[in-house]
Structures are given as C-alpha cells and as structure tokens.
A protein has these predicted regions:
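Histidine-rich, glycine-flanked metal-binding segment
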Residues: 6-63, 444
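Divalent metal-coordination and catalytic microenvironments
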Residues: 18, 36, 58, 69, ...
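Metal-associated gating/positioning segment near the N- to mid-region
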Residues: 57-124
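Short catalytic-loop micro-motif centered on adjacent basic/acidic residues
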Residues: 99-100, 130-133, 242-247
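A glycine-rich helix N-cap at a beta->alpha junction
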Residues: 119-135
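Histidine/acidic residue-rich metal-binding segments in metalloenzymes
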Residues: 141-318
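His/Asp/Glu-enriched, well-ordered alpha-helical/loop segment
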Residues: 210-231, 235-240, 290, 311-312, ...
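C-terminal cap of metal-dependent C-N hydrolases
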Residues: 333, 387-453
C-alpha cells in the first residue's frame, strides 16, 4: 500500500519492510531512494518531508531485470512492435533495462544508424536501453576500426533474415578476423546454416512446402547448433576473444562451457532464453508455429539440461529474445511463418513459476537476470541493490494468481504464446532511475529511460 504519493515524479521514495533478493541473500530491509539513486539500505525511519512511502511488507524486492537480448523492432518494423510499446510491456514484467539486437530496418551496421537508435530510444523508451552494433562480412573492416571497448557488444543475430550467409558461424574467416580484432563482447547466433539447409531439403523432398512445424527442431537440429558453437569456442580461445553464445538450446552444447571460474574471469559465456526453459517439442502440437523460434524449441531432455546448466553456472544469463510478429505473420504455413515471439512481459513470471515448483531459488533468479547481465556487459551502476547504484527495482508479490489474457497483454502485436497460463506471482511495482514507472497496472509515462553505459568505455 502506498501511504503517501504526491505524484510519480517524486525524487524521494522510501520502500519499507521489503525482502531484498540481492547478491545471494534474502533479508528484510528498507530502501531509501533519492535523485534516482539508492541512497541507503537498512532500517530507516519514516521521514516527514513529502517523500513517497511504499509498504513492501511480505513482498520481495529484486534489482531491475536486465534483458540481454530483445528485438523491439524500431526502426522500420514498427507494425510488430516499437521502443515505446515493448518497453512498456517490459516494465510490467519487471524489466528495467534491455539490450536490443541489430536486425531492424535498416540493419544496424554503422555508428550513424546505431546513434540514431539511441536518439529514438531517448525519446520513446520507458526503460533503460542499450543496442548491439551489427557485424557481418559486409561491414567487418569498419567494425574492427572502431574502439569497440565503448560498445555494449557486437552481434550477427537476426541478420541472416536479410541476407543468407550473414551468420558468423557460416564464415569462419570473418569470425576469426573479428575475434582477433574486437575488444567488445561478440554475441553470436550459433547455428550452421549449411546443416540447416541440408535438413530442410530432406523434409521438402518428403513433404513439399507442407512440412509440419513439429520437424522444426530436426531441421534446425542439435548438430547444427553444436558444430557452430564448438567451432566458435575454438576460435575464441585461439584469439582470447570475448565470445557470448546467444540463446543456447541443446543439452549437448552446455558441456562446452566452464563453471569452474567466476563470471568475471570467463571470456566465453552463454545464455538461455526463457522460452527454451518453458516449452519443449511436445508443445508444437498445441501451439504450432506460434512457438517457432530460431534456434528451435527442442526436446524435454534439452529443456531439463538447460535448466541444470543454468543452476550449475555453465549458463550465465536468462534472456527473452523478445521478437514480436503479428499473428498473421506467425500463423502462416511453416516455411512462411516468421520465427520469434514476444516474451519480455512474462519472463520474470515464468522464472518465478519455476521457483514455485521448487526448481530454482529467488537468489539464483536475481543472479541470472539482474547481476550477471550487468557483470557480463560491464553495465555501470545497475543490476544490484547497492547504495550509490541507480534505483532500478522490481517489487514482487509471490502470493497473487493471475492469468495471461488478451486484456492484459501489452505487446503491440497483441498476443503471447503463454496466453491462458495462470501464474502464481505478480510484479506489483517497477522503478527505473528512482521513478515509480509501473504501479499495479498503471504507468507513469512522463519519464524516459537512460542509455546504458559500460565501465569499459
């Protein structure tokens, strides 16, 4: 309950009696927020100076979620989603910061286009924002001339949609040159398109253009993923490059990653997208092309193996790979259906559902969704509940049930693959830079997020 609140633009907020989920511990404390920062954590008396006082009794306070992989579609693809609508959905899901991929229109293959995305986001995004610079064979020489240490990362993700052969995994010479010269995180989509095409041709011979979607994980196969990931790791080790494998999907691949050193010492990291933990190939019969992703949703064994690797620290992050398309685009036949789906509003709820099932701790959720993205991408003063850090915070009620429906889906595309699911936790408040931007279904749309900054720059 909010005891006093003049308006959401108040720069002073006291959150009382909440259970902080932070840095491997849960403890009851108060949090004092002023001028956008966490000023004090501990036992704090109510202050009679016009501050907002929020009673957090019985609720759990997480650092704001940092989603390390989204596709918010702006510029150029805004019939699917845009920085305003998708950041709003993110806030309702407790996500306070995101890093957006380069496969917009135009692709983000130059600093001019990258800077334009930052300009648009500063005007439109309610959450904090960062962007990958796209890299492929066409702009490699320009990229390696840049001081890439100032970037959050470079990536090839999604660029294969505009031109075949754009994936670094299919171009070992390009990948090797990049690894030898790039100081930034290199985040790659790890599938060998040659293997995918061979598999696709086999199924076309049998089914023509009417290949059932259930064969998607056999077309975009374990072999296609494993061989690409294994080769990328070999080259990254050779050049001591900073490699990050996006959206891992197979149990076999998890064994390629280390868990015997802390994240800060790793030069090779990986992530799992939340849908690869939630769905498996048994769901194709029910949901069809709505759960067509690249890389594909795979087997129950893979799903369980990914969760195990997340828990034992071979997998470092949980992301969404939020990729909205219209229902019309998704409901086409297999080969015409677009790959990807919207997830950013529901990712924390899914992970909290795993907590409810006894599969993961709250502390581990905070580690993989808040702390580790900040560490991996060297994001300045975010991802932790610490004095002096930006007040990006998410307050959670673990005892409220609600069902995903068209009425509460906030994505511009208007649908979700988890529609009809009943969750047993809810995000009640979300703070961004000290502003209460989401409060039990209501938004403060007067504020805008900030550009994420890296400590390397």
């Amino acid at each position: 309950m909010v005891k006093q609140q003049k308006n959401n633009m108040s720069t002073k907020t006291l959150i009382k009696n909440c259970s902080l989920v932070n840095e491997g511990q849960i403890r009851v404390a108060d949090v004092w927020i002023e001028d956008g920062l966490i000023q004090k954590i501990g036992q704090i008396e109510d202050l009679n100076d016009g501050a907002t006082v929020l009673d957090g009794t019985g609720k759990f306070l997480f650092p704001g979620i940092i989603d390390g992989q989204v596709h918010f579609r702006e510029p150029g693809l805004t019939h699917k989603g845009d920085l305003y609508t998708e950041s709003k959905a993110a806030l309702a899901g407790g996500v306070t910061s995101f890093i957006d991929m380069p496969n917009t229109s135009p692709n983000v293959l130059s600093m001019d286009i990258l800077n334009e995305k930052y300009r648009i986001a500063a005007e439109q995004s309610l959450a904090n924002f960062g962007f990958f610079l796209g890299v492929n064979g066409d702009n490699l020489d320009e990229v390696i001339k840049l001081d890439t240490s100032k970037l959050l990362g470079v990536s090839d993700d999604g660029l294969y949609f505009t031109k075949k052969g754009n994936l670094l995994a299919d171009n070992p010479e390009t990948m090797e040159k990049l690894f030898a010269n790039c100081k930034s995180v290199i985040a790659i989509h790890s599938e060998k398109e040659q293997i995918v095409e061979e598999n696709e041709n086999q199924y076309r011979e049998k089914y023509g253009e009417n290949v059932p979607v259930k064969f998607h994980p056999l077309i975009r196969s374990e072999k296609a993923c494993y061989e690409a990931t294994n080769r990328a790791i070999e080259l990254a080790n050779k050049h001591h490059a900073r490699l990050h494998i996006l959206h891992l999907t197979t149990e076999a691949e998890t064994h390629l990653f280390r868990n015997d050193i802390p994240l800060k010492e790793k030069n090779i990291t990986t992530e799992v997208s939340v849908h690869h933990l939630w769905f498996s190939d048994v769901d194709y019969e029910r949901l069809g092309t709505l759960i067509k992703w690249n890389p594909a949703i795979k087997t129950e064994k893979d799903k369980k193996g990914l969760l195990k690797a997340l828990l034992d620290d071979r997998i470092d992050l949980v992301t969404t790979d939020h990729a909205p398309h219209t229902l019309e685009e998704k409901q086409k036949p297999y080969f015409q259906s677009m790959s990807g789906a919207p997830m950013v509003q529901h990712s924390l709820n899914i992970m909290l559902e795993f907590y409810k099932q006894g599969l993961i701790s709250l502390e581990k959720i905070a580690e993989k969704m808040c702390h580790n993205p900040a560490i991996l991408y060297h994001i300045e003063k975010r991802g932790f509940i610490r004095e002096g850090y930006f007040a990006d915070l998410t307050l959670v009620d673990l005892n409220t049930n609600w069902t995903v429906s068209k009425e509460n889906i906030l994505y511009k595309c208007g649908w979700s693959p988890v529609e009809g699911t009943t969750f047993h936790s809810s995000i009640t408040q979300t703070f961004v830079n000290g502003n209460l931007v989401y409060n039990n279904g209501l938004f403060n749309e007067k504020t805008r997020g900030m550009a994420l900054t890296t400590t390397l720059g």
